[in-house]
Amino acid sequence: MAKYLGPKLKLSRREGTDLFLKSGLRSIESKCKLEQPPGQHGIRKPRLSDYAIQLREKQKVRRLYGVLERQFKIYYKLAASLKGNTGANLLQLLESRLDNVVYRMGFGCTRSESRQLINHKSIMVNNKVVNIASYQVSPNDQISIRNKSKNQSRIKAALELVEQREKPIWLEVNSTKMEGIFKRFPERSDLSAEINEYLIVELYSK
């Protein structure tokens, strides 16, 4: 599957917000000017149309979760087919991706690193190895690190970092055993207010 291999900070500057693509707890605001677009002096921002604003929001969310365009559109169509609010459904689908759950539980410092752990068969779901990053986790599923992978330094480093981070209330994590439970899908109020999913719904509704 294709993936972005360029500078990660450049993506965050382009979207004007920290996409948490780099490991560590300190916001990258101290490393780069998020309100200034990429380039030595940045580019003067033109007044954006409604379409451009909607497109930018979609790109921001897509990059935040590390999902390609085609796959993101599939998620949207699935979200629209489900009962309830389409925008909230979309966020729940993205949040229940295995790579995101592994990241939220603190087994990987970033979503990208979490995908690597999955690809290298270091992650188990209900005691079975799963190596598909887009695997949809269901409520009460158990996520754990394989025994032979528990001594990896990057996993230990990630678990040390997560102790200083706010823990999602829809997850239950035992850092000592390197396992956790996906208790439920997150409510919209549980997630970042910086995401405006309504703009994405408006974009795809045209």
Swiss-Prot record:
Keywords: Ribonucleoprotein, Ribosomal protein, RNA-binding, rRNA-binding. One of its GO terms (molecular function) is structural constituent of ribosome. InterPro entries: Ribosomal_uS4, Ribosomal_uS4_bac-type, Ribosomal_uS4_CS, Ribosomal_uS4_N, S4_RNA-bd, S4_RNA-bd_sf. CDD domains: S4 (cd00165). It comes from the Bacteria. Residues 96-156 form the S4 RNA-binding domain. One of its GO terms (cellular component) is small ribosomal subunit. GO terms for biological process: ribosomal small subunit biogenesis; translation. NCBIfam families: PRK05327.1 (NF003717), rpsD_bact (TIGR01017). HAMAP family: Ribosomal_uS4_B. Belongs to the universal ribosomal protein uS4 family. One of the primary rRNA binding proteins, it binds directly to 16S rRNA where it nucleates assembly of the body of the 30S subunit. With S5 and S12 plays an important role in translational accuracy. Part of the 30S ribosomal subunit. Contacts protein S5. The interaction surface between S4 and S5 is involved in control of translational fidelity. This is Small ribosomal subunit protein uS4. It comes from Buchnera aphidicola subsp. Acyrthosiphon pisum (strain APS) (Acyrthosiphon pisum symbiotic bacterium). The lineage of its organism: Bacteria, Pseudomonadati, Pseudomonadota, Gammaproteobacteria, Enterobacterales. The gene is rpsD.
